[in-house]
Amino acid sequence: MCCLFGIYDYGHSLTAAQKKRLVSSLAIASEDRGTDATGIAYNHNGHLTVYKRPYPAHLMRFKLPDDAACIMGHTRMTTQGDGKHNYNNHPFEGTAVIPFALAHNGVLYNDLTLRKDKNLPPTRIETDSYVAVQLLACLLYTSPSPRD
């Protein structure tokens, strides 16, 4: 299964280097739960940034801005959707009134039924988890907007 991790710099007391070190350490510690891909999401200057790669966490290189107070991350063990295709990796981007990022740990066994029953739009994203992004977007009358 996968792993979720993150930090919240509530007092804005950490430097970008300290946050990077913390997030990197958490990601590497999370490799026991998945090495097929690693990704992070954070807000920078009012814009959602998602960075993900089909690498284990110990090979992932990233930068964090000083103003990123909340950073979420995900290490993936592939269960559905080839992890070599980065669009299948977490976190996923969507829009439901405002842009959001979603990462999921687990397996949705009814994703194909949900796609059909809720008449969700076709997507090249093959994971079961992405149906949650689509459902959130449809619930609030917007559509997901994945970026690779």
Q: Residue spans of the language-model regions?
A:
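Conserved short alpha-helical segments that host acidic/polar catalytic motifs at enzyme active sites
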Residues: 1-143, 147
